[in-house]
Amino acid sequence: MLFVMLPRRSLRVLHTADVHLDGDVGGSAEQQLAYRERGRAVLRRIVDRALADEVDLVLIAGDLFDHNRVPDTTLAFVQAQLDRLRQPVVILPGNHDALYTRSIHDRHDFSAGAPHVHVIRRLDGQTLDFPELEVSVWGRAMEEHVPTFQPLANLPSRDDRRWSIAMGHGFFYPERQRPDRSSPIFADEVRDSGWDYLALGHHHVRTDVSQGRVAAHYPGAPMEGSSPGTILRVDFSTDDGVRVSSRPLD
């Protein structure tokens, strides 16, 4: 496959996933409340980092929420945080906040009054174009987390006139096989896509699954363990290509 690098503007992206707001961790009511508040603090710091780093685009690659039963107060909090941003934000539903009937995204439209917020809703995949940034973002919404759902199925050919970013939420397989895990992402799909960057979610540890000339990364869960957590900053330029670095949430 021939990769052609046409001149394009530089681009700076924040990539996160697996925030799992309002996760059920068991314990007392006080422990549950403390965990909820910690999750909210993490999302605030993600937005703070996007503003401090002056990113052009924010990608949330699945499982922003831990389940579809979160209360309206959590939805209002998330909306308030998204409203702090003015750059485009793309949200991909994951397996915990999948796009089935009565999902979070049926209850609340995060783009209402916030046209910079975009939720991937098409089950067969959709492309969002941002001409001012010279970037296209593709993703496929998840309705069911099953082995037959392939997050990168129907990925179209890249547009060489723009940066091409695909989003996916699922389990990575280094080789083709009959998947025993749901929502499989195969190494050859990554390699053969030819896209500039694959913004992935589901693995809770930062993982580089780049294949050939295609950069593909899981940022890890920003609330995993007791450390402050990190996100990924992805810098695109025609001179240096795609550079990925961890940024702390402190």
Tell me the role of every PLM-derived stretch.
Residues 25, 148-151, 242-246:
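Short, charged, solvent-exposed linker or helix-capping segments at domain edges/interfaces
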Residues 16, 217, 244:
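Residue-level signal for pocket-adjacent positions within structured domains
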Residues 57, 67-229, 235:
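His/Asp/Glu-rich metal-coordinating catalytic cores
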Residues 16, 140, 169, 247-249:
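Generic beta-structure capping elements
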Residues 1-77, 160:
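N-terminal active-site segment of His-dependent metallophosphoesterases
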Residues 224-250:
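C-terminal functional module detector
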Residues 9, 133, 240-242:
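Residue-level signal for beta-strand positions within conserved beta-sheet cores that form or flank
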